[in-house]
Amino acid sequence: NGVATTPDVNSQYWNPAKYAFSYSKAGVALSYTPWLRKLVNDVALAYLAGYYKLGDSDMQAIGASLRYFSLGEVPVAYQDENSPGYTIKPYEMAVDVAYSRMLSEHFSAAVALRYIYSDLAYREDEEVSAGSAFAADIAFYYTNYVILAQRECMLSFGLNASNIGTKISYDSGNTSQFLPTNLRLGASLLFPIDDYNTIGVSFDANKYMVPTRPVRGEDESQEEYEERLDRDYNDISPIKGIFKSFSDAPGGFKEELQEIQWSLGLEYTYHEQFSIRGGYHWEHE
């Protein structure tokens, strides 16, 4: 969780509106994360992010990031046992640029634009191709000081609606899939114990804003199901799908609530030099 935590160089991912409140003029970060290393040794996520504050007033900033996810080498075998098969190297990447600005002393907003490229295909199949899409994030951040237990604490709130954009296709536009659009809301509190020790608590709620894929009914023919699938899922626009995602769960309102993922984070910091962090994440099975 991080939509409402204090600004840092990696805010581009969680909430780019936080860049407007960054203390430093600029920052750059590079990270490399092995993925499922106990199962495979060549799957990893690389992430590069940075920002720069514009002007002398420090009320606005630009940010950018590059994400590259390598799925390693995947062996593909033919149905014919006599054919040797081959190896593919699927990967996905996203490049985005954001602009953030303080709208008041305590409130900021940001817009991010993103290009997504996903190459999961194998070239031997001419019907399958790499997919690309464009998306945008809309983010807000509010921070202020409040008095708790006679101490000045930093209370912050954040919102980020991410990956609002076009659909992505892997077959030259014959069929297309929704991007993983998300709505993330959060709050955080920094409580100074004394001049050297600080406790931070953060909380996030995340809603997947993609419509539920219809399930074929017991008395429904395949043709009837495919017609309903096109009408209620395949042919609707991404924007309509966002609104539909709040009311289309088969289990009604209870299932809509179960779709929300919850995250809780706790951080202890000593003298702004040493930190210990822990968190808990929950989502319905």
Predicted regions and their residues:
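Subset of outer-membrane beta-barrel
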Residues: 1-285
